[in-house]
Amino acid sequence: MTPSLSNFLSSLVWGGLIVVVPATIGLILISQTDRLDRKL
């Protein structure tokens, strides 16, 4: 694997983490604080 390719892949991984982790934390916090009655 070339250095530029490994840099590209690692930047993709870190970019995905930077997007996914805060979104997941935000969804968990919203679902914890939002106490509406959701009956399926």
UniProtKB/Swiss-Prot annotation:
Q: Report the SS bond pairs.
A: none
Q: Quick one: where is this thing mainly located? A: membrane
- Its name, as the record gives it, is Photosystem II reaction center protein X
Q: Known Pfam families for this protein?
A: PsbX
For this chain's UniProt record, which GO biological process terms are given?
A: photosynthesis
Task: Enumerate the transmembrane spans.
Answer: 10-30
Q: Where in the cell is it found?
A: Cellular thylakoid membrane
The family this protein is said to belong to: Belongs to the PsbX family. Type 1 subfamily.
* Listed InterPro entries: PSII_PsbX, PSII_PsbX_type_1_subfam
Look up and give the membrane topology term. Answer: Single-pass membrane protein
Keywords of the record, alphabetical order, are: Membrane, Photosynthesis, Photosystem II, Thylakoid, Transmembrane, Transmembrane helix
The terms describing its cellular component in GO are:
photosystem II; plasma membrane-derived thylakoid membrane
| Entry function | Involved in the binding and/or turnover of quinones at the Q(B) site of photosystem II (PSII). PSII is a light-driven water plastoquinone oxidoreductase, using light energy to abstract electrons from H(2)O, generating a proton gradient subsequently used for ATP formation.
What quaternary arrangement does the UniProt entry report? PSII is composed of 1 copy each of membrane proteins PsbA, PsbB, PsbC, PsbD, PsbE, PsbF, PsbH, PsbI, PsbJ, PsbK, PsbL, PsbM, PsbT, PsbX, PsbY, PsbZ, Psb30/Ycf12, peripheral proteins PsbO, CyanoQ (PsbQ), PsbU, PsbV and a large number of cofactors. It forms dimeric complexes.
Which HAMAP family would you find in this protein's record? Answer: PSII_PsbX_1
